[in-house]
Amino acid sequence: MEGGDSTISVAGRGASGSAVVAATVQAILQDDCYSEFLNEDFDVKTYTSQSIHQAVIAEQLAKLAQGISQLDKELHLQVVARHEDLLAQATGIESLEGVLQMMQTRIGALQGAVDRMKSKIVEPYNKIVARTAQLARLQVACDLLRRIIRILYLSKRLQGQLQGGSREITKAAQSLNELDYLSQGIDLSGIEVIENDLLFIARARLEVENQAKRLLEQGVETQNPTQVGTALQVFHNLGTLKETVTSVVDGYCAALEDSINNALDVKVLTQPSQSAVRGGPGRAAMPTPGSTAGFRASLWTNMEKLMDHICAACGQVQHLQKVLTKKRDPVSHICFIEEIIKDGQPEILYMFWNAVTLALSSHFHSATNSSMFLKQAFEGEYPKLLRLYNDLWKRLQQSSQNTQGTFSPSGTPDLCVDLPHMEDDTQDMFRLKRPDYDPEKALKDSLQPYEAAYLSKSLSRLFDPINLVFPPGGRNPPSSDELDGITKTITSELNVAAVDANLTLAVSKNVAKTIQLYAVKSEQLLSTQGDASQVIGPLTEGQKRNVGVVNSLFKLHQSVTKVVASQSSFSATAEQTIMSALKTIHDLMGNAIQPLLTSVADAIEAIIITMHQEDFSGASSSSGKPDVPCSLYMKELQGFIARVMNDYFKHFECLDFVFDNTEAIAQRAIELFIRNASLIRPLGEGGKLRLAADFAQMELAVGPLCRRVSDLGKSYRMLRSFRPLLFQTSEHVADSPAVGDIIPFSIIIQFLFTRAPAELKSPFQRAEWSHARFSQWLDDHPSEKDRLLLLRGALEAYVQSVRSRDGKEFAPVYPIMVQLLQKAMSALQ
């Protein structure tokens, strides 16, 4: 019991002591004096140095001693509280030492076994390494011996092939290609047995290359596909096909650049004139004033030679490309053209043509910038330059077609190994344009600056005669001679431009601008004052001037139309361009004559309206004497029209144009005459006879206004059809086949009002309008429906009037008018 109690008391004290110590430790940790010792980067020397510099060293030492004492107590308490765990850890350490000793023993045994294995493996390994090196050297020696044997054999075979000449050249190239392969990746220098052979092979390769180059040049020059194919096969066997073809094309490009420079060299062009007088230092080569013609003659001769050179070079390059396209290697069956373009390189003809066009553009630009004489020659005689280009293009197309014929399957079967006949057509750049590249446009792009300058000068040449014949302040239109001068200038410009369709179109646009300028100048001469449209007295000065302007416009229109018709190579677009401009001339003629036409039409209408001032209500004459053949207004109308045609329109030289405009006046006059004739109320039998005579005379009255009265169409037929209706009954009038077809229903119903009693008023009477105002209303309402509705209103008003007076019946003509109205309304639906 005592022992148990003591144990419990010790444990209790230990627990309470631990709590006290924990609190003490916590106090130490929170104390600034001890907190520095917890830092990971605590340095004893630094701490000591700081403590020495402080004044109270004794206090710090005492503080540290106190802290050490407290920590010792804490450690003691920890050991007492965990003494069983600590004893267990100590026992485990002893066991671990035993395990480690056992592992050390086993590691020693393993090391001994490894040493024994090493002694058994090292010796065989060294032997294997030695044998492997020996085998590798043997293989290298065998490979070298095989190469030497093959080189000796091929060298001997090559000697025989070279003795065979051009017939064996492709085989010689194949042998050389194999010899090159044997020499790759190995150093054969210093081997005496093949030293002479290697020298021979180098000389043979050079000889074969030279022979192949000569064969290629000769074959391309004579366009012999067999020779070209043989040479290409040689270079293919040598492995230099692509490099050789590129070199050949580059050579053609360089030669053409030299030709362009020589053709445009001013010193060469002026050499004859400069031979007598040597230019000093810094003096430019320029043509003397008297030698400009010789300079230009030499220039165009050089240009023709340049075009010949370009054509020949293009033909040779195209021939080369076509052989490349058709030729296949007999062993690999690879088409040669595929070898050229396999790295994305374009076709050689495209490459060459692009280089040619760029060279032309750059050299032409630099040459004309440095020489004003060259620039003036190319700009002033641009059509000649363009003709050379067009001829070159035609020759290239023809040459392309001829080259295609040369490569027919029956002609060179040795070149057409497993290759479709049409495959090379896709390569024909001069006959089949690509969607993304136009070779003809690329060629002519070098001419753009000269074309623009030529067109500008051409426009000036076209404008100059017009500006001369229309001086500032001038009031008279051009004379016939002046118009002839303008026409000759237009003809000359179009004839010179006929060398090219695009140039013709561009010059046609200039001609159109010229015509428009003439129209603007002529319009400024037109008189727009009141006296320009008078039809009372003789021609005024303004009217005379307008007649002269219209006549000059007509002459120009006729002349230019003949010029266009005489151009055999005119395109539809170019012709349409000029004809559109001529339409402005025609429109201006119409505008110039329109005021006079309007005055004539107004005067005719005013005369026709006066028919209502005459009395048509009389009965037929019983004396047997013939009545007046026609009314007074008709005589006045005939006299007026005859006078107008004689005094005004006779002076116009464009009769067809005048009749085209006066025929409309004649048609209008007939329509007004019939309209007003249908409004006459009352109309007696004698009035009908006189009105019938007026109808007959109306044909004669409008005769001067047209070529033939029958050409007036519907108006003339209506005039002829209406006259018999004057004497027919209302029923026959309504049943006439002319009603609705030739004569509008509204006119017939309007005419039937004349046969009705006064109570049935005409529409204008009901509205209390004058005849002139009613006629104006009809002009403002051309719709037949509007006119019929107006007539229906008059009939309905009549019905209301009858009913309002309690009438028992309607006028006999009323049902006929209603029937016609219903028929007319039905026809409109």
UniProtKB/Swiss-Prot annotation:
Keywords: Cytoplasm, Golgi apparatus, Membrane, Phosphoprotein, Protein transport, Transport. It is a peripheral membrane protein. One of its GO terms (biological process) is protein transport. It is found in: Cytoplasm, Cytosol; Golgi apparatus membrane. Its main location: cytoplasm. The modification Phosphoserine is found at residue 166. One of its GO terms (cellular component) is nucleoplasm. Pfam families: COG5_C, COG5_N. The keyword Protein transport applies. Belongs to the COG5 family. Component of the conserved oligomeric Golgi complex which is composed of eight different subunits and is required for normal Golgi morphology and localization. Required for normal Golgi function. This is Conserved oligomeric Golgi complex subunit 5. The gene is Cog5.
